[in-house]
Amino acid sequence: MSGSSAVPADTEQVIPWRSSPAVRVGLSLGIATGLYGISFGALSIAAGLTFWQTQALSALMFTGGSQFAFIGVLSGGGAGAAAVGAASLLGVRNTVYGMTMNALLRPRSWRKLIAAQVTIDESNAAASAQPTFLERKRGFWVAGVSVFLLWNLFTAVGALLGDAVGDPGQWGLDGAAVAAFLGLLWPRLREREPLAVAVVCGVVTALCIPLVPSGIPVLVAAVVALTWGLLGARATRKRARS
C-alpha cells in the first residue's frame, strides 16, 4: 500500500463529518467488530480466566485474532507459553500495519502512543480505503477508537454472561470462537494469496494435531504463515528493484 495517491492535506476538499464516508465506514466496522467481544468474553471465562484477566486481554492485547488464539490454546489444554506464542505470532501483522500507518498519517507526540494501541485490521482497512489524507485520518481514528470502546464493552458483557450461563457448551457458545474467528478472517480471503495461506496453514494444523501437544499446531501454522509473508515481501522487493 502506498500513500502516493492521497490528495495533499492543504489542497483537498474538506467533507463534513456527518457526510464523511470514512466516518461511516469506521463506525460500521466498530459496531460489527465490537459485537464479537461477547463471544470472546464468554469463552475466556469458560477457558478459566477471571473477569479482570479477560478485560485486561481486551484492553492491552486488543487484537481479536490473537485473543481468540490465546484462549483457544488454553481451552484446548495447551500451556500458557504456547498460548502466548500463538497470540504473538498472529499479532506480528500489526507491526507492519503500524509502520504503514505511521508513514501515512504521521501522528505526533501522545497521539502516536494511542495510534499504536488502535492499529488493528479494521483501522488499517478504514484508512487505506480512503482517497485523501484527511479521510484516511478520520477512517483510522473512528474505526480504531470505536472498535476499542465497543470491543471492551462487549467483552465485559460476554464475561458476565459467561459467569451466568456456566458451561458454554449448553448454549452452543463452545463453537462461537470458531465462528467469530472465521468472521474476522473471511473478508481477508477474497484474494488468491491469503486464501492459499489459509488452506496451507489449515492442512499443516490438521497434520500436526495427532503428532504434537495441544496448542503447538497453532504455533506451527502461525510460523508457516509468517514465513510465507516474509518470503513474499522479499520477492516483492526484488521485483521492485529489478
Where are these regions (language model features)?
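Pore-lining transmembrane helices
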Residues: 14, 23-116, 134
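C-terminal ends of transmembrane helices
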Residues: 96-104, 125-131, 183-190, 228-240
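Helical membrane-embedded segments and adjacent short helical loop/helix-boundary regions
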Residues: 20-36, 49-55, 60-63, 169-190, ...
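Intrinsically disordered, low-complexity non-transmembrane regions of multi-pass membrane transporters
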Residues: 1-22, 134, 233-242
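Membrane-embedded alpha-helical modules
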Residues: 135-220, 227, 231
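Short juxtamembrane and helix-loop transition motifs at transmembrane-helix boundaries
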Residues: 12-22, 44-51, 75-79, 104-108, ...
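Helix-loop-helix junctions within the multi-pass membrane cores of secondary transporters/permeases
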Residues: 11, 84-174
